[in-house]
From Swiss-Prot:
Effect of mutating residue 178 to C: In GM2G1; infantile; inactive protein
Post-translational modification: N-linked glycan at Asn-115 consists of Man(3)-GlcNAc(2). N-linked glycan at Asn-157 consists of either GlcNAc or GlcNAc(2)-Man(7-9). N-linked glycan at Asn-295 consists of either GlcNAc, GlcNAc-Fuc, or GlcNAc(2)-Man(4).
Modulation of this protein's activity: Addition of GM2A stimulates the hydrolysis of sulfated glycosphingolipid SM2 and the ganglioside GM2.
Impact after mutating residue 247 to W: In HEXA pseudodeficiency
Protein name: Beta-hexosaminidase subunit alpha
Keyword annotations: Disease variant, Disulfide bond, Gangliosidosis, Glycoprotein, Glycosidase, Hydrolase, Lipid metabolism, Lysosome, Neurodegeneration, Signal, Zymogen
Subunit comment: There are 3 beta-hexosaminidase isozymes: isozyme A (hexosaminidase A) is a heterodimer composed of one subunit alpha and one subunit beta (chain A and B); isozyme B (hexosaminidase B) is a homodimer of two beta subunits (two chains A and B); isozyme S (hexosaminidase S) is a homodimer of two alpha subunits. The composition of the dimer (isozyme A versus isozyme S) has a significant effect on the substrate specificity of the alpha subunit active site.
């Protein structure tokens, strides 16, 4: 798509300001007009095309049809609108959906195709996609195109959209260790992710404060590592529900079990797993990272990750590897002896590398791929060529753009998170800081830039729990969502502000308590109940 065509579509959208063009994220190709069609809520239908590979019984689309019908019109009945003058009615009051390839019972993957086209004119109202995942994205766009007049009539404008994501991995991280998030909060977050066309839920499940995951192989991990083994855990059924709920919205679940650091919550449940710290020649009574010198450590990891590999069906697991503090390892005489025998000298990065390489081999043997934090790359751990490196540090050891350059120059795929830590808040419209980030603004060849597969907004939990999660996430995470979905040239802040403000109001209408971007109001505030 040429830049002139993009800017023409932006100008056209500005000319028809309002619900008909307040789309978020912005499509790749968009044409519209002021010609509009009436929708009648009482008998509006989503319908499979006769030639569609997906037909009634397709769980992904059957449930999406009901979900979006409720979002558009609610579950009640509507009086037939009183219309004056000539009005066009949407063809048969139906959106026809056609999917080229089957896949209703599958899981989304990194390679899933999410392209779709949406045509609304005098002759047809058609959503065409290669896959059910593209159809989901198109249904979200359709839902945002429908608008209601002050008199209560539903309209949709004549529209032609051709759309696809810029990056295949568009994620959101939730930290459920530092503060436990109820299952309902996670499911609600998945809903809003789908509204924003985000497609990866990065589930950070282990950290020092708590471990809420219920392991059936090592139940003591949860019993002794969670805040409360009854109320603050995720059961096997909870995990299954999250995975299926996400699947029905075209969202992958990327589970993170971070080691060897960030694992103090595992210590009580698995005696001997963590490294005893020493003060001089005596144990201090405190513990550090996982002990990499013991065979028992790797036996535990083999068994635990065999379980995890079966519970979480996505091809990838996130294995962490960040912020390993060597202080405790340095103090421990058994660790020192192990390093001498291995020929590591006093280079604790070699010890870390030994542990992580062994863990990666274990996970690979289960047919899994893996994502790691950037320290694994920075510390020169020997990793497989298909490893995905997540860049999270803004300027240590180098600026994050330089880090992307180095990671991709080495031939690894990369994810960007460094500028998108949503748990960090400031006064004013900080969404703009997230929005203006250009993920490919580093020096590198086209081949290097093709290795950046997307990014993630991160919501770490030190100061975030169920009471403030939603307004801190939304609509700020939407700025990241558009940056990862839309064309690079969709970058005008004024245009973004108008649409994001409207989208925030739409989120409120859908029951999401998204915070305001600035002074103003939402039109639904004036409606009398």
């Amino acid at each position: 798509m040429t830049s002139s065509r993009l800017w023409f579509s932006l100008l056209l959208a500005a000319a028809f300001a309002g619900r008909a063009t307040a789309l978020w994220p912005w499509p790749q190709n968009f044409q519209t007009s002021d010609q509009r069609y009436v929708l009648y809520p009482n008998n509006f239908q989503f319908q499979y095309d006769v030639s569609s590979a997906a037909q009634p019984g397709c769980s992904v689309l059957d449930e999406a049809f009901q979900r979006y019908r409720d979002l558009l019109f609610g579950s009640g009945s509507w009086p037939r609108p009183y219309l004056t003058g000539k009005r066009h009615t949407l063809e048969k009051n139906v959106l026809v959906v056609s999917v080229v390839t089957p896949g209703c019972n599958q899981l989304p993957t990194l390679e899933s195709v999410e392209n779709y086209t949406l045509t609304i004119n005098d002759d047809q109202c058609l959503l065409l996609s290669e896959t059910v995942w593209g159809a989901l994205r198109g249904l979200e766009t359709f839902s945002q195109l429908v608008w209601k007049s002050a008199e209560g009539t539903f309209f949709i404008n004549k529209t032609e959209i051709e759309d696809f994501p810029r990056f295949p991995h568009r994620g959101l991280l939730l930290d459920t260790s530092r503060h436990y998030l109820p299952l309902s909060s996670i499911l609600d977050t998945l809903d809003v992710m789908a509204y924003n066309k985000l497609n990866v839920f990065h589930w950070h499940l282990v950290d020092d404060p708590s471990f809420p995951y219920e392991s059936f192989t090592f139940p003591e991990l949860m019993r002794k590592g969670s805040y409360n083994p009854v109320t603050h855990i995720y059961t096997a059924q909870d995990v299954k529900e999250v995975i299926e709920y996400a699947r029905l919205r075209g969202i992958r679940v990327l589970a993170e079990f971070d080691t060897p650091g960030h694992t103090l919550s595992w210590g009580p449940g698995i005696p001997g797993l963590l490294t005893p710290c020493y003060s001089g020649s005596e144990p201090s009574g405190t513990f550090g990272p996982v002990n990499p010198s013991l065979n028992n450590t790797y036996e535990f990891m083999s068994t635990f990750f065999l379980e995890v590999s079966s519970v979480f069906p996505d091809f990838y697991l996130h294995l962490g590897g960040d912020e390993v503090d060597f202080t405790c390892w340095k103090s421990n005489p058994e660790i020192q002896d192990f390093m001498r025998k291995k020929g590591f000298g006093e280079d604790f990065k070699q010890l870390e590398s030994f542990y992580i390489q062994t863990l990666l081999d274990i996970v690979s043997s289960y047919g899994k791929g893996y994502v790691v934090w950037q320290e694994v790359f920075d510390n020169k751990v020997k990793i497989q060529p298909d490893t995905i490196i997540q860049v999270w540090r803004e300027d240590i050891p180098v600026n994050y753009m330089k880090e992307l350059e180095l990671v991709t120059k080495a031939g690894f795929r990369a994810l960007l998170s460094a500028p998108w830590y949503l748990n960090r808040i400031s006064y004013g419209p900080d969404w703009k800081d997230f929005y203006i980030v250009e993920p490919l603004a580093f020096e590198g060849t086209p081949e290097q830039k093709a290795l950046v597969i997307g990014g993630e907004a991160c919501m770490w939990g030190e100061y975030v729990d169920n009471t403030n999660l939603v307004p801190r996430l939304w609509p700020r995470a939407g700025a990241v969502a558009e940056r990862l979905w839309s064309n690079k040239l969709t970058s005008d802040l004024t245009f973004a502000y108008e649409r994001l403000s409207h989208f925030r109001c739409e989120l409120l209408r859908r029951g999401v308590q998204a915070q305001p971007l600035n002074v103003g109001f939402c039109e639904q505030e004036f409606e009398q109940t």
